[in-house]
């Protein structure tokens, strides 16, 4: 990206807000899924909220997910994790309802080549489906014959195929959902700025962070932003932020 390019008027007006003598209730470092979620929640509760990202929004891990909103099928092996499975199913249903233009049901087929393999998978997936009681199921788990499996998966290895099992989860566009959350936060009054990395901190008398120093990559101008609360949502770069505050801390 050309950081010498002229920025748009909308960005300039946002940056001007940083020059106001204002103490923000919430300051968030990181514009990925976690930061966006915090921004929505804080702004919706009436807190003055500002968010900074050193790159573009959703440029890190939040754009490199599996693209799945699954109900936790991989956790079915351990009964101690079944509570987590149930929680994942509830969240999956909420996302399907709140963002149907981004999150949608998706079928998955497990081809089976061993005797009783279909029955083995079917038993586990039926239990998985049963845990979606109360309207949280996405689709019906079903046996598939070898012919039907080949019809639905034309590229599957046909030699020795006994059949298949189809179950349902959900798929989504991670970056689009992230940006949708950011737009929601902005509509609630949050100030969101990308390409504005954090470059330093100032502490108050009690050791708490009272000022966060940031720098606009386009203009090179630095700003000192007063805040009451800081959220480190920098993802894999969270340790870098922690060491800026306390160089002696152990890494996560």
Predicted regions and their residues:
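Extreme N-terminal leader/targeting segments of oxidoreductases
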Residues: 1-26, 41-45
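Short hydrophobic core segments
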Residues: 28-29, 225-235
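Glycine-rich FAD pyrophosphate-binding loop
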Residues: 43-65
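Dinucleotide-binding Rossmann-like beta1-alpha1 core, especially the glycine-rich loop
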Residues: 67-152
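Helix-loop-beta segment of a Rossmann-like dinucleotide-binding subdomain
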Residues: 150-188, 209-215, 221-225
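A conserved short coil-to-beta-strand element within the FAD-binding core of flavoproteins
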Residues: 194-210
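Flavin (primarily FAD) binding-site architecture
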Residues: 232-247
């Amino acid at each position: 990206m050309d950081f010498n390019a002229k920025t748009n008027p909308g960005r300039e007006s946002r940056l001007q807000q940083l020059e106001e003598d204002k103490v923000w209730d919430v300051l968030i470092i990181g514009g990925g899924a976690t930061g966006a979620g915090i921004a929505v929640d804080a702004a919706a509760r009436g807190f003055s909220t500002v968010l900074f990202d050193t790159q573009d929004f959703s440029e890190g891990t939040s754009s490199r997910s599996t693209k799945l909103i699954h109900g936790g099928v991989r956790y079915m092996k351990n009964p101690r994790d079944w509570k987590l499975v149930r929680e994942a199913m509830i969240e999956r249903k909420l996302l399907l309802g709140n963002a149907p233009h981004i999150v949608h049901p998706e079928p998955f087929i497990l081809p089976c080549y061993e005797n009783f393999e279909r029955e083995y998978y079917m038993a586990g997936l039926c239990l998985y489906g049963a845990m979606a009681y109360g309207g949280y199921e996405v689709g019906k788990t079903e046996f598939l014959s070898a012919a039907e499996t080949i019809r639905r998966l034309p590229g599957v290895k046909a030699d020795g195929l006994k059949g298949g099992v189809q179950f349902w989860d959900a798929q989504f566009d991670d970056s689009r959902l992230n940006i949708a959350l950011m737009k929601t936060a902005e509509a609630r009054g949050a100030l969101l700025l990308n390409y504005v990395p954090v470059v330093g901190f100032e502490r108050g008398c009690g050791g708490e962070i009272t000022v966060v120093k940031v720098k606009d990559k386009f203009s090179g101008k630095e700003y000192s932003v007063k805040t009451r609360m800081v959220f480190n949502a920098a993802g894999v770069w969270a340790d870098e932020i922690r060491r800026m505050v306390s160089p002696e801390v152990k890494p996560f």
